[in-house]
Amino acid sequence: MAEVANNEQQAPQFNIQRVYTKDVSFETPNSPAVFQKEWNPEVKLDLDTRSAKLADDVYEVVLSLTVTAQNGGETAFLCEVQQAGIFSISGLTEPQLAHSLGAYCPNILFPYAREAVGSLVGRGTFPQLNLAPVNFDALFAQYVQQRQAAATAPAAEEANA
């Protein structure tokens, strides 16, 4: 009887329904003067992920990248890309689902976002920009660790009071 119950449990399923650009922005606030300066930029990458449940076993994951290039203390360009995907995910435990939404799906979306950023920077006539790979598994593990530390900190403070 237990074997029948185990066989009836849903096997893990993961499908990409759609990958799309949700929002994009490219600004060169100091053009054309920025093109006349020696190019020695400081490039900063900020990224964020968020997810939302759309229906049973259907989720949207959005990876947001903001790339800012400073050259000589001025903003050369600001590029923002929100790359999104709709994923069907079922048969996972809660921690597995959280990992899928927080690390696995962003890993799928990142190459698309990186290509969009590179294309926008090129269309702005700036030198080629190659974003380094991002370890979303490590970022997700760090996020989980920070949440656990934050959850135990108030309990520790109450115990010391």
From Swiss-Prot:
Main localization (coarse): cytoplasm
Annotated SUPFAM superfamilies: SecB-like
Any one cellular-component term (Gene Ontology): cytoplasm
GO molecular function: unfolded protein binding
Keyword Cytoplasm: yes
InterPro entries cross-referenced by the UniProt entry: SecB, SecB-like_sf
Similarity section: Belongs to the SecB family.
HAMAP family named among the record's database cross-references: SecB
PANTHER family with a match to the protein in the record: PROTEIN-EXPORT PROTEIN SECB, PTHR36918
Protein name: Protein-export protein SecB
Organism: Shewanella sp. (strain W3-18-1)
